[in-house]
Amino acid sequence: MILYVNGDSHSAAAEAAVPYAFAQDDSLYYALGRRPHPENERVSYGCNVANQLRAILHIDAESASSNARIIRTTYQYLKDEGTPDAIIIGWATWEREEWLHNGEYYQVTAGGTDMVPDELMDRYKAWVIAAADRYAENEIRQHESIWQFHSMLKDLAIPHLFFNTYSCFSHIRQNGLAQYAWGNNYIDPYVEESTYYHWLKRNGYQTVNPNSYHFGADAHAKWADFLMPRLTQLL
């Protein structure tokens, strides 16, 4: 059995065991680039779920990822590797984007600290300033793109479980916009309390330090236990 996991830093288990977001942040694993640090990956919710399923785990999650990257790399995995037995995806916040420049993809976030080529810096600064104004528009657009992605996976009969890591589709809910019938494939996408971050906080888990949004190994194990019955009913 093969379990495929994609997402952002929460699915990459950033800081869960060691204080790194990317493998390359640790000189011992620099060659792994932006992949999850191996010690963090071993305690990730994905690894916990894979162990319970006795499955082979493939993680494509990357810290600071946009949802565009998540969809693109999942498509690429399906094209290159074929169909896994199950997919879990934790969706990132809606403001993030992926830019393609000179054949390389860049993930941009509203934090204003992303590394982009010098020729993109003016565009990036303007983008950060305007990010808040575009948030609702981005949420609506990504709501649609995730629905299309979900529909494709349904057509391919690939069991998949989605959840939101931090942000829910709050603008859509609050403004009475059309909500899709996701069935059991998406955990309460319109409810903030059911996102990974807020659910763990509500259940007494703290981040690894007060300045971080990331949780430790104990929280990842708990989230895996939360996901397991929801995933197994799809298998």
Q: What are these model-derived regions, one by one?
A:
Residues 1-68, 216:
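Serine-esterase "nucleophile elbow" of acetyl-processing enzymes
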Residues 41, 69-70, 141-145:
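Short, glycine/acidic-rich beta->alpha junctions
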Residues 63-74, 170:
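Acidic-and-aromatic substrate-binding clefts and catalytic sites of carbohydrate-active enzymes
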